[in-house]
């Protein structure tokens, strides 16, 4: 849970929000969760919150949802481009042994979520 708090704080900083209001924090966390689900839906299995591209994707998604600086469309388009890249990259669309502890290639029950 600590990593999620860190990610929430990164998003708060990216949005230039200094308020620690519970309502704003909840909205940021909802956006983070929605982004992760969206990435999973296109086949991204490796959602490491310390990975620079995953953090960037979440940042773009959150900025689009919050309409940051009136550039929601720009951020949404950038997010979609990165989402496509992540979904096609074997680094992100496969689960490694270190992620799961077992080899899951070809196994139906090896997917995240669901």
Where is each model-derived feature located?
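C-terminal structural segments of small proteins and small subunits
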Residues: 64-88
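Conserved short "hinge" loops at termini or chain/domain junctions
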Residues: 1-54, 77, 88-114
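Mid-chain, well-packed structural core segment of small domains
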Residues: 45-52, 57-71
